[in-house]
């Protein structure tokens, strides 16, 4: 019964894990020769695979230069149900293969020469060489040289060289030796000798390259003064023994470094293999194409294992597909396999194996080798980021690095976001691949530049490193280095004096300082009259006084200046013997003129005198500056939501007790306050060490949580870089206030006297000069931020205007309208009451006398605004009718009293 139950459980688990995923994966193989080293490497790589699914090869031996045969074999394997095909091609067959792969969605993995294609279903294992070749030519400062090439490899490298030659004014003589005979070689080199061409680039495959070098030796063109650059990735695959004694200089590239740990281990396993197919391999010089073949098999294995873990159904059911169907029917699961292949990344025989979105190798390193009469030596390396790095840099970085490269170093670090973090699916990885973060990538770059293998180990106590005051023992990462448990510390480890006494630091890879983290306060709501905020209260008061003062001055100068008074124009029929002088700038008109100018609206009157115009001009200039300044500030004040921070600096913290503040329990920040002699920091340290409950926290995460839960009653002191990172993480409720309290840096630490000190130091300087350190910080701080482009980094956030921002403007409008209605009502009542009183006292005058008085009266020439109103006008004159003297003595009786009234009673 137990056996049945166990069998059932095993079957159920297998069905869950590998649901819809085949246990056996058919892969194709197209090889030009069954006895080739590449074929042996292919079979050996398959024999080393242990994890499911199992790769079953379908191998065909084919003439890779025959398009018809290649088409037949390709379609045959596709019809048999292969999931991917590994093989070689030549110039005559590459277009056919890429066309079929793109149409059918079948992935083709090849170690052949790279081609410029946008077909992502062709995975090119061989790195591109053109950029590295140009870097070497530029390093040697060649201006005139010969480029010998084989057209069978394509023309991409030659085209790149010619394009660069046009930019840099190089003189390049290109020679195609595809069909060159032995006599042709002789004539070629004789012609080059006549032209004194002794700088030559040879771009050929290894077999043809050996033949060309043989002709060079035979024609004795390998003496002193000749310099050959071999545009080939297998410098060690070529027989150069006869060049050692000749004096010629030969430079080339080596993709595989068989002295590295991984290649040496794999090569030893291959050499010791008992498989019969491997016995004919030349173990002294395995070719780089064989290493590419081995890595190609591993690429396929890694991709299918990834698909199996993700439970992606790629099984081929029913008809396997017709290769020659018209129109071609693409394989539905092909795109999933293509994506999985491009996402593979591992350290293989050829170094870092990684592909870009076009299926080409990326992030690879080429070793630059040179052979002179004194032997073969490495003169540097080339990669996509650094370009060519001469070996002189390596020598300065610690002399001979062979001792560095012959062991695996322990790199201690600490789990701290975003420096070192466990991946979400860390249980699916092993070793260094389980981690990600700024320091993880930095450690990889340092190891690549120095040239050593390493293993990341998280410090057991989770501390950076401090000395116990009682036992004098070091803990944390510093203790790991001091007591020999680690070789390097790559972490946010602050460079301090006490640490520098026991360990060595590199140059800082990041500059920072102690900063203050608080909980982000609530945004303050704008006041009703927030539109007045752009100018201070004192300025508004000064503007009011200036307005009144200008109006009074304008009134006075208008009264004193004779040019401000003017006569009214006479109307036709008016007696011109009388002359009325008027002045438009009474006190009310002066106030109205000043208000109109300040509001930039103007009015109907303007000063006539020079003094009045001076007053108006300076007032206009004053209002121009004030209004412009107000408008400039108004946009910022109305569209920015402001947060009122309870503290803005360390001084604010020190002089209050309501908000508690603390640091990490063991770290450089605590040591800074403990050792500081600055009064403010001494006061803060006195508070922190005596505060109850304790204000110190064990981890940065604990401090962050305490800030968030304290409701603004706790401030955490930490490095500015970590503060900025936390500010960018959800729930985006913390913020950095004030400037940094000090200035320091993070460094890579090594034990005292370590051989890694100088190499690591120079590597950090190089990464800084290349801008890689800034790129890494932007990647892990801001590109991966969760608080938007503004993030928590800004205390002010631009937003649209709300009604509360401009409510005061509407209140003033409503108030002004109400006041106008009230004043109009008062004016109406006052006028009605005045008219009523006047009418009651009006005397009765005979109609004939009144008519005669009206006919004989003299009217002013220009009634104007003041004349039409009667009584005293704004212009300072009195307008009245001039009745004849005969009418002035007419007696009249009041209706009320019957008393006689004179003309003056009117």
UniProtKB/Swiss-Prot annotation:
Its main location: membrane. The keyword DNA damage does not apply. The chain crosses the membrane at residues 537-557, 610-630, 806-826. SMART domains: Lig_chan-Glu_bd (SM00918), PBPe (SM00079). It is a multi-pass membrane protein. It is found in: Cell membrane; Endoplasmic reticulum membrane; Postsynaptic cell membrane; Postsynaptic density membrane. Widely expressed in brain. Residues 1-18 form the signal peptide. Residues 585-600, 601-603 dip into the membrane without crossing it. Belongs to the glutamate-gated ion channel (TC 1.A.10.1) family. GRIA1 subfamily. Homotetramer or heterotetramer of pore-forming glutamate receptor subunits; heteromeric assembly can be the result of both receptor subtype and flip or flop form and according the composition, one partner can be dominant with respect to the fast desensitizing current component, whereas the other can determine the steady-state component. Tetramers may be formed by the dimerization of dimers. Found in a complex with GRIA2, GRIA3, GRIA4, CNIH2, CNIH3, CACNG2, CACNG3, CACNG4, CACNG5, CACNG7 and CACNG8. Interacts with HIP1 and RASGRF2. Interacts with SYNDIG1 and GRIA2. This is Glutamate receptor 1.
């Amino acid at each position: 019964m137990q056996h049945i139950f166990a069998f059932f459980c095993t079957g159920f688990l297998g069905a869950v894990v590998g649901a819809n995923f085949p246990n056996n994966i058919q892969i194709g193989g197209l090889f030009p020769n069954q006895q080739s080293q590449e074929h042996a490497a292919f079979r050996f790589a398959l024999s080393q695979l242990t994890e499911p699914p199992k790769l079953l090869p379908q191998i065909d031996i084919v003439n890779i230069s025959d398009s018809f045969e290649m088409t037949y074999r390709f379609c045959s394997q596709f019809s048999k149900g292969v999931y991917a095909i590994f093989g070689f091609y030549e110039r005559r067959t590459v277009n056919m293969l890429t066309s079929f792969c793109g149409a059918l969605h079948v992935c083709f993995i090849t170690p052949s020469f790279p081609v410029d294609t946008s077909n992502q279903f062709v995975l090119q294992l061989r790195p591109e060489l053109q950029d590295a070749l140009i870097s070497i030519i530029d390093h040697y400062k060649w201006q005139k040289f010969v480029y010998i090439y084989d057209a069978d490899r394509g023309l991409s490298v030659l085209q790149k060289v010619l394009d660069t030659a046009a930019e840099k004014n190089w003189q390049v003589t290109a020679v195609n030796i595809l069909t060159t005979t032995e006599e042709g070689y002789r004539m070629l080199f004789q012609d080059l000798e006549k032209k004194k061409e002794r700088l030559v680039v040879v771009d050929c495959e290894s077999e043809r390259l050996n033949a060309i070098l043989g002709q060079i030796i035979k024609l004795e063109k390998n003496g002193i003064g000749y310099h050959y650059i071999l545009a080939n990735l297998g410098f060690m695959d070529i027989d150069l023994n006869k060049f050692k004694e000749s004096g010629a200089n030969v430079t080339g590239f080596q993709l595989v470094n068989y002295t590295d740990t991984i290649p040496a281990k794999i090569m030893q396993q291959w050499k010791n293999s008992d498989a019969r197919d491997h016995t004919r391999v030349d173990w002294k010089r395995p070719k780089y194409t064989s290493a590419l073949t081995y890595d190609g098999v591993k690429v396929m294995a890694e991709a299918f294992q990834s698909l199996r873990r993700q439970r992606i159904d790629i099984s081929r059911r029913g008809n396997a597909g017709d290769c020659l169907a018209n129109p071609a029917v693409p394989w539905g699961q092909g795109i999933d396999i293509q994506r999985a292949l491009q996402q593979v990344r591992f350290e293989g025989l050829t170094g870092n194996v990684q592909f870009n979105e076009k299926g080409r190798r990326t992030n690879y390193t080429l070793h630059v080798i040179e052979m002179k009469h004194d032997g073969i030596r490495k003169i540097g390396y080339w990669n996509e980021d650094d370009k060519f790095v001469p070996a002189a840099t390596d020598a300065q970085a610690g002399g001979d690095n062979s001792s560095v490269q012959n062991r695996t170093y322990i790199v201690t670090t600490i789990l701290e976001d975003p420096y070192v973090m466990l991946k979400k699916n860390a249980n699916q990885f092993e070793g260094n691949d389980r981690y990600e973060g700024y320091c993880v990538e930095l450690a990889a770059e340092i190891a690549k530049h120095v040239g050593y293998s390493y293993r990341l180990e998280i410090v057991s106590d989770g501390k950076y490193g401090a000395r116990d005051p009682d036992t004098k023992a070091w803990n944390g990462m510093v203790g790991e280095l001091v007591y020999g448990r680690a070789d390097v510390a790559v972490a946010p480890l602050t460079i301090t004096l006490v640490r520098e006494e026991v360990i060595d630091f590199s140059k800082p890879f990041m500059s920072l300082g102690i900063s203050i983290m608080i909980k982000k306060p609530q945004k303050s709501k704008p006041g009703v009259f927030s539109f007045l905020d752009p100018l201070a209260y004192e300025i508004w008061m000064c503007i009011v006084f200036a307005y009144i003062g200008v109006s009074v001055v304008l009134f006075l100068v208008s009264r004193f200046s004779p040019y401000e008074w003017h006569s009214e124009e006479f109307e036709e029929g008016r007696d011109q013997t009388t002359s009325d002088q008027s002045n438009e700038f009474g006190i009310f008109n002066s106030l109205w003129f000043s208000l109109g100018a300040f509001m930039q609206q103007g009015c109907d009157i303007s000063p006539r005198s020079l003094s009045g115009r001076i007053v108006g001009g300076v007032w206009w200039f004053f209002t121009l500056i004030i209004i412009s300044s107000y408008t400039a500030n108004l946009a910022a004040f109305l569209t920015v939501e402001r947060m009122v921070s309870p503290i803005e600096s360390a001084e604010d913290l020190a002089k209050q007790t309501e908000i508690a503040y603390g640091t990490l329990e063991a770290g450089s920040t605590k040591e800074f306050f403990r050792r500081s002699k600055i009064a403010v920091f001494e006061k803060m340290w006195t508070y922190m060490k005596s505060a109850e409950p304790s204000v110190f926290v064990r981890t940065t995460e604990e401090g962050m949580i305490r800030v968030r839960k304290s409701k603004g009653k706790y401030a955490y002191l930490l490095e500015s870089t970590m503060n900025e990172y936390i500010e960018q993480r959800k729930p985006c409720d913390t913020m950095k206030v004030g400037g940094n309290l000090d200035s320091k840096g993070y460094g890579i630490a090594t034990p005292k006297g370590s051989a890694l000190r100088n190499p690591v130091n120079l590597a950090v300087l190089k990464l800084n000069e290349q801008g890689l350190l800034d790129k890494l910080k932007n990647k892990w701080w801001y590109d991966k931020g969760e608080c938007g482009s503004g993030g928590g980094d800004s205390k002010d956030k631009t937003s649209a205007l709300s009604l509360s921002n401009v409510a005061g403007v509407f209140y003033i409008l409503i108030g002004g309208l109400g006041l106008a209605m009230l004043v109009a009502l008062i004016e109406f009542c006052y006028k009605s009451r005045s008219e009523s009183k006047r009418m009651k006292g009006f005397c009765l005058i005979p109609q004939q006398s009144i008519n005669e008085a009206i006919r004989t009266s003299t009217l002013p020439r220009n009634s104007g605004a003041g004349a039409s109103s009667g009584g005293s006008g704004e212009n300072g004159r009195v307008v009245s009718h001039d009745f004849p003297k005969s009418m002035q003595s007419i007696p009249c009786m009041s209706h009320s009293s019957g008393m006689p009234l004179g003309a003056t009673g009117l």
